[in-house]
A protein has these predicted regions:
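Ankyrin-repeat alpha-helix packing hotspot
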Residues: 113-114
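Conserved small/polar residues in nucleotide/adenosyl-binding loops
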Residues: 133-138
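Conserved glycine-rich Rossmann-like NAD(P)H-binding loop of the short-chain dehydrogenase/reductase
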Residues: 24-40
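The beta1-alpha1 cofactor-binding region of Rossmann-like NAD(H)/NADP(H)-dependent oxidoreductases
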Residues: 35, 57-69
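Short alpha-helical oligomerization interface
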Residues: 94-110
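Conserved hydrophobic beta-strands of the Rossmann-like cofactor-binding core
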Residues: 3-6, 84-85
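Conserved NAD(P)H cofactor-binding loop of Rossmann-fold oxidoreductase domains
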Residues: 87-93
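Conserved glycine-rich cofactor-binding loop
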Residues: 8-12
Length: 138
């Protein structure tokens, strides 16, 4: 069974991607920050696709400690990863002044640039492992 992580998969394009891959029999893991919305999205995908292999980890992509913890939890649970889809984004035009994170990064930059880079770096080993057995392309 192929495995995918999708950030921001509880709504929009991420949700539709998760649903389509679940329909194809993939094991889908969502990395999202809102627990209730993510639980509802997972349950809805499971029901609509009859695929029980839809799960999630809570992660705040603007917090690099949270990103690292989510990856550690995933690695403890799974031995392989075929695809990482960095879908989540922070794009709020109503914010007039920068929001600085605990990591001393501007929040949108942390979420949209640093977190995808960190996720890709931390999960590279699993992706390469899948590549060796012909399941992923890194």
């Amino acid at each position: 069974m192929k495995k995918v992580i999708i950030t921001g998969g509880n709504s929009g394009i991420g949700y539709q991607t998760a649903k389509q891959l679940a329909e194809k029999g993939w094991s889908v893991t969502l990395f999202c920050r809102r627990k209730e919305a993510t639980e509802q999205a997972c349950e809805k995908i499971r029901q609509q696709t009859e695929n029980p292999h839809v799960d999630y980890f809570l992660v705040d992509l603007s917090d690099m400690k949270s990103v690292r913890q989510a990856v550690e939890q995933y690695i403890q649970k799974e031995e392989t990863l075929d695809v990482l889809i960095n879908n989540a984004a922070d794009f709020d035009l109503s914010i007039k002044s920068p929001v600085i994170t605990k990591d001393r990064l501007e929040k949108q930059f942390a979420t949209n640039v640093v977190a995808p880079y960190l996720l890709s770096s931390l999960l590279k080993g699993l992706l390469e492992q899948s590549e060796k057995i012909g399941r992923a392309h890194v």
